[in-house]
């Protein structure tokens, strides 16, 4: 059959006027650069604690960082989302004795998961059913964790380890606070990460460190209430939301 005849048959089976164009998701950025020193309107929704001016990193204290940790949790929990972190099974590739993965989930700034082995380190997150994840929040601190702080984080998602696909790589250049990763480029209709399994891979640390620290991570699904965009989070912060400022003034 000639090409014209083939096209007629195909048009009869699926009329071209009924076929809607589909936007490809392959053009979505595969790397997300994180640096809360750089004030950028395009990334403001990422930083739950807000942007930090570079001068405010000179004299931070553990109390300042601890305040940011708990402040971020309060802001996240007020954002009309449901925290499903503890509905998952969390399985690390390794952990140092005394620093289990539970310490990344206990809402305590002073405790953390620490890997114990060769890179890349890995953290698998498994739910009993498919979840509609709208936000993955991770606490990073270059100051507190130094060479234990990850500089790259690869995110994979799927229904199981066997079909998990790469979603995005986070390049953590300089962050001290909570980062809220939303999935705006994943599904055009609902902007959710629909999955039962998530894998986080930590291939590289800052300062060529070997083991990784993770002080806090949370997963959220939408609630039945109207969704609150993350740009509203900044409105819940105190007028001087840069908590390092107090340390400098002292």
Curated annotation (Swiss-Prot):
Pathway info: Protein modification; protein ubiquitination
Domain of life: Eukaryota
GO molecular function terms attached to this record: enzyme regulator activity
InterPro entries per record: APC10/Doc1, APC_su10/DOC_dom, Galactose-bd-like_sf
One Gene Ontology term from the biological process aspect of the record: protein K11-linked ubiquitination
Localization in the cell: Cytoplasm; Nucleus
Residue ranges annotated for the DOC domain, each copy included: 60-246
Major subcellular location class: cytoplasm
PANTHER family: ANAPHASE-PROMOTING COMPLEX 10, ANAPHASE-PROMOTING COMPLEX SUBUNIT 10
Other facts: Present with 1364 molecules/cell in log phase SD medium.
Entry function: Component of the anaphase promoting complex/cyclosome (APC/C), a cell cycle-regulated E3 ubiquitin-protein ligase complex that controls progression through mitosis and the G1 phase of the cell cycle. The APC/C is thought to confer substrate specificity and, in the presence of ubiquitin-conjugating E2 enzymes, it catalyzes the formation of protein-ubiquitin conjugates that are subsequently degraded by the 26S proteasome.
Name of this chain's protein: Anaphase-promoting complex subunit DOC1
Source organism: Saccharomyces cerevisiae (strain ATCC 204508 / S288c)
Biological classification of the source: Eukaryota, Fungi, Dikarya, Ascomycota, Saccharomycotina
Name of the encoding gene: DOC1
